[in-house]
Amino acid sequence: MAMRLSSAAVALALLLAATALEDVARGQDTERIEGSAGDVLEDDPVGRLKVYVYELPTKYNKKMVAKDSRCLSHMFAAEIFMHRFLLSSAIRTLNPEEADWFYTPVYTTCDLTPWGHPLPFKSPRIMRSAIQFISSHWPYWNRTDGADHFFVVPHDFGACFHYQEEKAIERGILPLLRRATLVQTFGQKDHVCLKEGSITIPPYAPPQKMKTHLVPPETPRSIFVYFRGLFYDTANDPEGGYYARGARASVWENFKNNPLFDISTDHPPTYYEDMQRSIFCLCPLGWAPWSPRLVEAVVFGCIPVIIADDIVLPFADAIPWDEIGVFVAEDDVPKLDTILTSIPMDVILRKQRLLANPSMKQAMLFPQPAQPGDAFHQILNGLGRKLPHPKSVYLDPGQKVLNWTQGPVGDLKPW
C-alpha cells in the first residue's frame, strides 16, 4: 500500500501527471537520444562480426538447466539466454576459421541453494574444465590464450566468483580469463573484478512477466519515491554497516517516516504496478553495486536514483545514464529528500520522455525470441566495436602467456 503523501508532494505529482498527459496529446511523450549515443543504441550488429559457438558436452550447460530450471528465471540467467540467442543468430558462423570471436557456453550460476541463490564456489572449477576442453579439442584458444574469446559471467562480482566483495577482491579474476573479454553485470571503476575491456550488461529481468503487469500509460505517478527491498542483511552482516556500505540502512533510518518516501522491506504483488505509479525509484547498491531494480525502473519509466559510488552502468556508451537517472553519492543519502525535491520539473519531464523511448527499454531486456536493439544486440555491438583484434593478441606457436597453475588450490581440482 502506497504511503500518504504530503500536500506538496501530491501537488507535484499531479502537476507532473497533467503535464505528461498534455505531452501525450501533443505526441511529445517520448524523446530520442541525441548524438552518437542514440546511433549506437540503434546499431545493427549483423554483418559487422561473426561468432563461433563451441559445442561443449551438455554437462557444462543444458544438463544444468534440466536439473534445476530455476536457473532460467533468476537475475543471472543472461548466460543461458545469450547461448540460446547465439545458436540461431545471423552472426553465428559454423566455420571457426572465419570467426572474429569465440564463445564458450558454460553456465556458472546454475548451482542453486534450496532458496534459489547461486553458489559460485564451484564456478572456477567449471570454467577451468570448459577452457581445458576447448583448448584440447580446437586450436583457437591456444592461438591467443583466449584474447579473441568472450565469456558471460553474470555473478555478483563477475569472474571473481564470490558474492561478498572482500572475498571477491581476495580471489581476483580467474587467471585463465585474464586475456578474454568478459561480459558481466558487475561494474565498478578501479575494481579488481572489472578488467579493462569488459562489457557491462544489465541483469536478467523476465520480460514477459513485466509485460503482464503494465498499467495504462495515462496512469498518474502519485508516488514520489519508491523502494522495496532489504535495508539490513542480518544473516550475513549481523553487526550492520557492511551490507550496502550502510547506504540502505541510511535510507531507512532517515526516511522511514517521511511521507515522500514509500519504502519497505515488504514485496507486494503490486510491485511492478507501484513502480509505474512512481516518479523516482531508488536503486541502491546491495552486496554488489547493481540489481534488477535498474532494469525495472527503466522499463517502467520510473527515474532511477542510483546510489552506488563509482558504478559502471550497462551499455554506458549507448544509454545516457546521466540524462535519464539521478546519481546520489552514498554519503549524501541523508540529503536524499532535498536532492530529489530540488530537481526542476522540466528536468524530471525530460527524463521521463527519454525513459518512454522504446529503444531505451529494449536495450535493457533479454527477450525470447530476440528483438532488434535488445540487450543481446547491444552485447554484439560492443564486441563489434572491439574489432579488428590487434596483431599483438596472436601468439607465436608454442608461446604461452597464462599460468594454468595460478590461483587457489581448490580451484585446480578437476570438475
Curated annotation (Swiss-Prot):
EC number: 2.4.-.-
Membrane topology (UniProt): Single-pass type II membrane protein
Entry's Gene Ontology molecular function annotations: glycosyltransferase activity
Cytoplasmic side of membrane: 1-4
Positions annotated with a glycan in the UniProt record: 142, 403
Lumenal compartment segments: 26-415
Superkingdom of origin: Eukaryota
GO biological process: cell wall organization; glucuronoxylan biosynthetic process; plant-type secondary cell wall biogenesis; protein glycosylation
Cellular component aspect of the GO annotation: Golgi membrane
Location(s) in or outside the cell: Golgi apparatus membrane
Main subcellular location: Golgi
Keyword Hydrolase: no
Keyword list, A-Z: Cell wall biogenesis/degradation, Glycoprotein, Glycosyltransferase, Golgi apparatus, Membrane, Signal-anchor, Transferase, Transmembrane, Transmembrane helix
Claim: Glycosyltransferase is one of the keywords in the record: yes
Transmembrane segments: 5-25
Xref: InterPro entries: Exostosin, Exostosin_GT47
Family classification: Belongs to the glycosyltransferase 47 family.
Task performed by this protein: Involved in the synthesis of glucuronoxylan hemicellulose in secondary cell walls.
Protein name: Probable glucuronosyltransferase Os01g0926600
Source organism per UniProt: Oryza sativa subsp. japonica (Rice)
Lineage: Eukaryota, Viridiplantae, Streptophyta, Embryophyta, Tracheophyta
